[in-house]
Structure formats: C-alpha cells, structure tokens
Amino acid sequence: MYFKRKEIEKFSSFKGPLIDVRSPGEYYKGHMPNSINIPLFDNDERSIIGTIYKKEGRKKAVIEGLKFFEKKMELLLDNLFMSIDSYKTIPNKNNEFFIRIYCSRGGMRSQSIAWLLDKYKLNPITLKGGYKIYRRWVLDSFSKKLNIVVIGGKTGTGKTRLLSLLEKYKYQTIDLEGFACHRGSTFGGLGMKEQPSNEQFENKIAEKLYSFKISNSIFVEAESANIGKCKIPHEFFNQMKNSRRIEIIRSESNRLDELIDTYSVFKKEELQESVLRIKKRLGPQRTKIALESINNERWDLVCKSVLDYYDKCYEYEKVGKTNIKILDLTDKKYDESILELVNNVL
C-alpha cells in the first residue's frame, strides 16, 4: 500500500505537518488544532459532488471529483509544498518525517492527497476514520476522571492572571476563557478574537487534556456553563462543579485596581456598548454613572458601578457549592499568591 493509516493517538504522536483536506466550511466548523486547511474541494465543489452522489450514485460522484482534482493538482502541490517547507519539524524516535493527512472519514479525499505526496517520496500517513473518529475521541476524553482544582473568586480577584502564572510555572492548567476567546461577562469579548465554534472549543480542551498526566492536579478558573457562545462540555463541567474549589479573596481596592488595569485600555465606545447590554440589570442610576464615568475616564467609578451587580451574580452562582477553601490574597503580589495557592492545593 502506498500510504499508512494510523489510529488517532498514534497519528497524533508523529511529528510533521498536519493537513486537513476537507472543504473550508467543514474546517471552519471544527478541525484538529494546529492543522492547516488545504482543501481538495472548495465548498461549492463539495456541494456539487454531494448532489451527484445522492441523485446519480457513487461512481459518477467519484468521476466528477477526479475532474476537479485533475484541474487543481498543480495548485494543490504548490500549497502542500509551501506548508511542508515552512514547517519546522522535530524528528520522531526513528528520525522519520511524516505528512499527516485527514479528511472527514479517512476516505478518498485523504487517500488522494496521500497518493499524490507518495509520488514525491514524502512519506504521508492518513488518519483511520478521519475527523469523525477524532470527534469521538474528543468527546470520550471528557468522561475520564480528572483531578480538577477550580479557582473561584469575585470579579477582579485576579483569577485569570493566577491561572496564567500557574501555566508559566509548568502546572497543568486549562484556560477555558482563552480557548473560548471570551472572558465570560458582558465585557468578555473586548479585545478578543472571534469566538471559535463550540466544536472547536471542545477540540482545544481535549487536546490540552491529552497533553496532561491525568492523575496530577488540573487548574481551571470557575466559569458558568457558557462562556460567550461557547458551552463547556457537559461531562467536564459536571466534574468542575464537584471538584475542589479555592475561593480567592482580595480587598475591594485590590479588585478595582485589577479591573482598571484590565479594562481602561479599551475604546470608550466599546465599553459603553457593553454597559448598555446590561442596563436593565444595572438600573438607570448605575447605568448613567457608568456611561458618564467612561466618557470622563473615571475608571474607578466605572468599575465600582458594575462591581455590585457582578458580586450579586457571583453569589447566586455559588449557592450550593461545597468543598470550598478560602484563600485571602489581599495586598499580596502574584508570585507570592501562586506559592500560597499551590501550598494549599498540592
């Protein structure tokens, strides 16, 4: 056989370019993280082939697909070679370099590209079962028993910064807000990239879990079930709810400093739009104060005007939570806070 087909974990363990040959639409919905999309067929071509398959059968659909393939073979090769050349490879144990290719189900699309690359002695491998089997692997990963430690605390207690430092010091962390490109509040999308699809959000979490030693502690920030439009996988979220929880406490002054540092860099118009989205919950007086304070760059008043609202929301979400340990980090620097946090967990 001119190419090798690998099971998902074996496929993922090899080093080399990771090529997704599905259509751009399929790729946008969800893909293996760090993969490059070099589609065998664009969205329209895939639709045409699919229609022929339904109306006239597999044979005619394959013939039509081969026509598209023949016309763009040179362009495909150029794109493939460009991706391969730009990839900084790390040899595997056998010093072999593989081009990893996958399509929807491990069928003709990935096989066709593998055949093409094999002609140039480029050692392609394909994913057995394709992206469909990968998604099954992703969803299965959330049912594993995990040693999660949830970092909780009111808005402005520096939870995200603590999580970032934990990762810097090589502790196992999952930045759910980073993966979701959203901070989880009405201001959460400010300065962030477009949110990924929920499918892609799940893929990122699963890949991170795969890199961990499951028996060791995994730190995550306390979140609602939804982060913007991204929904935390149900089984993973249930484990978060039943895990150990460290509740960070800081003074109001500390919290205001943190919020001012985070949000004062954004455009006034963006901040005002965010305030208006929760005006019914803030009430007319606090909304007016917040909007005027943004206009006058009184960031302390802006943050104070919304802090009470978020504190009430947080207390409501915390109802029924057990296994909570309080950690007062008022006036402590973040490096010092990390040591205290780790000493209280590990």
Task: Report residues per predicted region.
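Glycine/alanine-rich phosphate-binding loops at beta-alpha junctions
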Residues: Y28-D78
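Conserved nucleotide-sensing/catalytic segment adjacent to the nucleotide-binding pocket
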Residues: K168-N238
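Short hydrophobic beta-strand that contains or immediately precedes a catalytic carboxylate
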Residues: L18-R22, S35-I38, I174-D175, F219
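Conserved NTP phosphate-binding and transfer environment spanning the P-loop NTPase/kinase superfamily
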Residues: Q239-R245, I249-L346
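Flexible, polar/low-complexity N-terminal or interdomain linker segments that lie immediately upstream
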Residues: M1-P33, A61, L139-S143, I148-K154
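Glycine-rich phosphate-binding P-loop
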Residues: M108-R109, N147-K168
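A short glycine-rich beta-strand->turn/loop micro-motif centered on a GG-aromatic cluster
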Residues: D118-R135, D175-A180
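Catalytic cysteine-centered active loop of the rhodanese-like fold, especially the PTP/DSP P-loop
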Residues: L66-L127
